């Protein structure tokens, strides 16, 4: 399966005008891992566009979503939220 990095800016989160709980529930349902406050890893058999379109339905039209596919040996990080190393070991990005 491909590993995707999903980043978002939830513009209306601070205003309290949108309920983002369904977004977080969907990420958890898919076994995604939160690496930073607004950054998740998810493993899926989809294209980058399909992943973005899927998660777009859980946010407002003015929220921002960025999806990119990780490739083996083509990423690096520091001070990620606990469990990131384990998640990547169990869901290694493809070459």
Swiss-Prot record:
Q: List cofactor names only.
A: Mg(2+)
The protein's name:
CRISPR-associated endoribonuclease Cas2
Name the Gene Ontology molecular function terms of this record.
metal ion binding; RNA endonuclease activity
Q: Does the keyword Cell membrane apply?
A: no
Kindly list the positions annotated as binding Mg(2+).
Answer: 9
Note the superkingdom of the native organism: Bacteria
Quaternary assembly: Homodimer, forms a heterotetramer with a Cas1 homodimer.
Report the source organism. Answer: Methylorubrum extorquens (strain CM4 / NCIMB 13688) (Methylobacterium extorquens)
Which UniProt keywords are listed?
Antiviral defense, Endonuclease, Hydrolase, Magnesium, Metal-binding, Nuclease
Mind listing the GO biological process terms from this record?
A: defense response to virus; maintenance of CRISPR repeat elements
Q: What is the lineage of its organism?
A: Bacteria, Pseudomonadati, Pseudomonadota, Alphaproteobacteria, Hyphomicrobiales
Q: What does this protein do?
A: CRISPR (clustered regularly interspaced short palindromic repeat), is an adaptive immune system that provides protection against mobile genetic elements (viruses, transposable elements and conjugative plasmids). CRISPR clusters contain sequences complementary to antecedent mobile elements and target invading nucleic acids. CRISPR clusters are transcribed and processed into CRISPR RNA (crRNA). Functions as a ssRNA-specific endoribonuclease. Involved in the integration of spacer DNA into the CRISPR cassette.
């Amino acid at each position: 399966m491909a590993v995707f990095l999903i980043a978002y800016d939830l513009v209306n989160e601070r205003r309290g005008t949108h309920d983002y709980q369904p977004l977080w529930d969907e990420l958890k349902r898919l076994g995604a891992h939160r690496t930073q406050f607004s950054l998740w890893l998810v493993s899926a058999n989809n294209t980058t566009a399909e992943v973005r379109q899927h998660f777009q339905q859980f946010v407002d039209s003015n929220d921002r979503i960025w999806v990119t596919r990780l490739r083996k040996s083509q990423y690096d990080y520091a001070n990620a939220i606990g469990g990131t190393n384990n998640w990547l070991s169990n869901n290694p990005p493809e070459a």
